[in-house]
Amino acid sequence: MTAMTRTLSRIGLILFVVGFLSPLLMRKAGGEELWPLARQQRDVHRFSTLFLAQDIRDSLSNPSGIEKALLWCKKTGVTKVYIEEYRDGYQAKREAILRVKDRFLAEGFEVAGCVTTTKVGKPSTGWKDYISCYTDLKTQEKIRVIFEYAAGLFDEVMIDDFWFTDCACGKCDAARKARTVRIGNKSHPVPGDTWSDYRSELMVQLSREYVLGAARRVNPRVRLIIKYPQWYDQFHERGYEIVRQTSDFDRIWVGTETRDYDDKEWGGTVQYEGFFIMRWLGGAGAEKCGGGWYDWLGTTEKTYIEQARQTILGGARESMLFCYGGLQRETGPGNVEVLRGHIPELLKVAAEVKSRKLIGIAAYKPPNSEPGEEAKVFDFVGMMGLPLVPCHEFPAEAQAAFFSIHALKDPGLAEKLSRFIQSGKPVLITDGLASRLAGKVGLDRPNVIQLKVNSAPPSLLKLSGSEIDPLRASLLRPFKLEFLAPNRTALYLFDDGSWVVENFSNQPIEARLNGETISIAPRAWVCRWKQGEN
């Protein structure tokens, strides 16, 4: 019997399966009983929501609307609300904002502000219905005014994930070629002449001067939060520069809205991405990383709950339920009703995750790295039951590692990877990266496994369990683990021997972990936590 097998068998483990919650938990989630539980647990994990500027104008414009929102929040276990000052060209009125703010504070909620930088000034040549040209000096001034207004109302302000630009107008193109960013009357050099170079420098400098600087001049106490979108492979192309912006802002937030993979409008993202991006940005942001943010768009009740699970397994300290108004329509009410029934368990899982260190196969994505033909490959590899530990720095000390085309961003990759391979540790490398490293790194060693992505990461979902099992056998050897399961099954490992297995398929499955059979219902998870030694 291995050490891990003994660990899994040891008395003191707690087993519970989502989808088979106890009647007690379900009763507790039925009404306002959720509110005291959520308040008690908010230092472990809190649920929050956002009132759009338009919600303040419309549904929260009178006392009855505010009371309705209060009741909804309490029934949903929400203990913090964000009140938006600006969105889509509309700035909410000061009196209306303060009326909502004061009422929620009086009821014991935490309250913060929010800004969504859509339809500001000159439109972009790209997503022109929402995104702006920030080379335009008048548009920059409008940004300054918006954030001065928000900072005058709140000590904490989040920026929704439209804080980017995709403009390629004549002025932007000329500035890109000149390798110069101008913010007001100040000029800043740009290190290169690509659109990524220009837009990243533009958004970094604009944030420093007209977001952070402007807000702090009005309110020295204000904390600014930048929310990153879930499309992590394109951040730098549109001006999100996670190294400098994470350093500059007081906190960061993470978009974990994966939605339904098969949805015709919103689909194409597998559920595991919520976990991957939460952990990847959590590593880059460390204590600055506040939480995740997901919505109802393109979801079913099952995918909505999966977004919640992945956010919490990703180590988030807060789950933003976007947004109050949206959750009153379409799939929102059904999603929320199901979420309420799961919140007690989600809070318990959050407490267990918080007290442990994630372990597994290091998955290296350097900041600002290009995916080539392997976009989102990490998400699909995670769906194969390979327990990933996302990282933004080369994982020299990892026990096993996965490398994709993204790793080429690291100028020292060839030397670092050669040393890692020579150490004898298991390495999984994509065929795309292997072809680019031919003649530079010795890959013909028994500890190196090549993953055939064939320039189509979604094709990995078609691999059978029997095709994946040999990969797992090699890569999990340092952890003294054997894991057998179908595709669309995720494994999460912790340093004390605890684990979670989640079934993303629509059929019940049986997985085997070190000889133990684990039966998992469709779209459910099994969590096993080792007690007493944390």
Which positions does each model-derived feature cover?
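Coiled-coil-like amphipathic alpha-helices with heptad-repeat character
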Residues: M1, T5, S22-P23, K75
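Bacterial N-terminal signal peptides that target proteins for export
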Residues: T2-I14
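Bacterial N-terminal signal peptides
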Residues: I11-L24
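Signal peptide processing junction and immediate N-terminal pro/mature segment
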Residues: L24-E32
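Glycan-processing catalytic domains of CAZymes
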Residues: E32-E415, I421-Q422, D431-G439, D444-K462
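A conserved amphipathic helix/loop scaffold
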Residues: G382, H392, S404-N534
